[in-house]
Amino acid sequence: MTAPKPVVLCILDGWGLRAEREANAVALANTPTFDRLMATCPNATLITHGPDVGLPRGQMGNSEVGHTNIGAGRVVAMDLGAIDLAIEEGTFARNPALCDFIAKVKAKGGTAHLMGVVSDGGVHGHIQHLIAAVEVIAASGVPVVIHAITDGRDVAPTSAGGFVQQLAEALPAGASIGTVIGRYWAMDRDKRWDRVKRASDAMLHGQGERAADAVAAVAAALARGETDEFIAPTVIGSYTGAMDGDGFFCLNFRADRAREILAGLAQPGFDAYDTGRRPDWSGFLGMVDYSTEHDRFMTTAYPKQVIRNTLGEWVASHGLRQFRIAETEKYPHVTFFLNGGKEVPEAGEDRYMANSPKVATYDLKPEMSAPDVSDHLVQAIGEGYDLIVVNYANPDMVGHTGDLRAAMAACEEVDRGLGRAVEAVRQAGGAMIVTADHGNCETMIDPETGGPHTAHTTNPVPVILVGGPAGARLRAGRLADLAPTLLELMGLPQPEEMTGRSLIEA
């Protein structure tokens, strides 16, 4: 048969499946298009967590992991598991980049500043990585100051007190906590530089709220009505800021939410906001690569692996045209992560980024920029592209707020866009796969605490085939199977590096 054109991959970010309707935004929302597709089109479910996406068993997936696996067409071993194993086996302490960092700081008589996520969420960082790094550096005789980034998003919203207590009790002699900062301030990815400045002012200059210790900082924030994600940058004890000769080590192993704060702390020529005088760092280390720009002023403990013949690269190598579209919050995922960590577009790859709305939290505007995404998606479907990849951010980003009604509104807005896309694909004679990278908004109440659930889930996600071959069925699978499925629809062979299997069964 003639290959359909275009073939569209529509990713409903954070749209999981759960049988129970209670606090299930996906089930409770009015989504006539999604419901019709599930009732009339071939569909199945995908696994998005644990070893099926290269993570430790039981570890929930996330957008970076999901899009990396989708684009690779194979299970990609993720940094969380690799770092866990290095710590367990003792090779972390001998990591060449870490040893070089310690030597440089020691030679200058400086202090090592460690910034990391203080939770066991495992999406951007992990408290055990932070503790392990403190132990290694302190054992070398270098003083350590920790910049504790509280989570409340990939874990329960008010769990930071316990994690901070755990960290404080694990600290060896010569190590202390210098600041406590909610990730809202320190881990922005949408150029909200007013937030980032507040975080860097605390780390660089000791400016912000004050507290005697880290546990007291969390308690004071809660008394101010701030849950963990939003804890105002707080300076602990006698901490006064960073000095010339100090070193800085960022322990985040996911790039997107580390880039801005690191640029503010050390990027030469940085001018997005007034940083004040920055120290002459003796060493500036990252757990992973954050971008080619960051590589110019940072060293890396665990450089990224090269993923050859991703979906985008393979499609480009056959002289075909492709289009990527998302709003700001998920734009890196349909470009950088889907392309295996490559910044530069492939030949014939066009992109569009809709600007995410400038609101404090997305429950205030649950439609986000989905209408703009939908407009450009429908336009692209009619423009002769061979492959289109689109991400709707709403179910995930609004799901993270814990607001059920807003999450329902988010799903309804996405469903409207999905309806427009389905009709455009039908008119163009194309085909579409509708799926998600992980779950989120299908669970809005924590079953253990009864409070808001703001994290991702390990629930299965849907995969639906629209406009596929007559009589086709879909089997259950995992995210790595999506690229081979798209290639089959496009009539392209599968590169040998892709070990995923097409989900289409005749």
Curated annotation (Swiss-Prot):
One record GO biological process: glucose catabolic process
Similarity field: Belongs to the BPG-independent phosphoglycerate mutase family.
Keywords: Glycolysis, Isomerase, Manganese, Metal-binding
Residues reported to bind Mn(2+) 2: 13, 63, 437-438
SUPFAM superfamilies hit by this protein: 2,3-Bisphosphoglycerate-independent phosphoglycerate mutase, substrate-binding domain (SSF64158), Alkaline phosphatase-like (SSF53649)
Pathways per UniProt: Carbohydrate degradation; glycolysis; pyruvate from D-glyceraldehyde 3-phosphate: step 3/5
Protein name, per record: 2,3-bisphosphoglycerate-independent phosphoglycerate mutase
Subunit structure: Monomer.
EC number per UniProt: 5.4.2.12
Cofactor(s) needed: Mn(2+)
Coiled coil: none
Binding site for substrate: 124, 153-154, 183, 189, 254-257, 330
Taxonomic superkingdom: Bacteria
Reactions listed under catalytic activity: (2R)-2-phosphoglycerate = (2R)-3-phosphoglycerate
Molecular function GO terms recorded: manganese ion binding; phosphoglycerate mutase activity
Cofactor note: Binds 2 manganese ions per subunit.
Protein's UniProt keywords contain Metal-binding: yes
InterPro entries linked to this entry: Alkaline_phosphatase_core_sf, BPG-indep_PGM_N, Metalloenzyme, PGAM_B_sf, Pgm_bpd_ind
PANTHER family linked: 2,3-BISPHOSPHOGLYCERATE-INDEPENDENT PHOSPHOGLYCERATE MUTASE
CDD domains recorded: iPGM
Function description: Catalyzes the interconversion of 2-phosphoglycerate and 3-phosphoglycerate.
Enzyme active site: 63
Ribosomal protein listed as a keyword: no
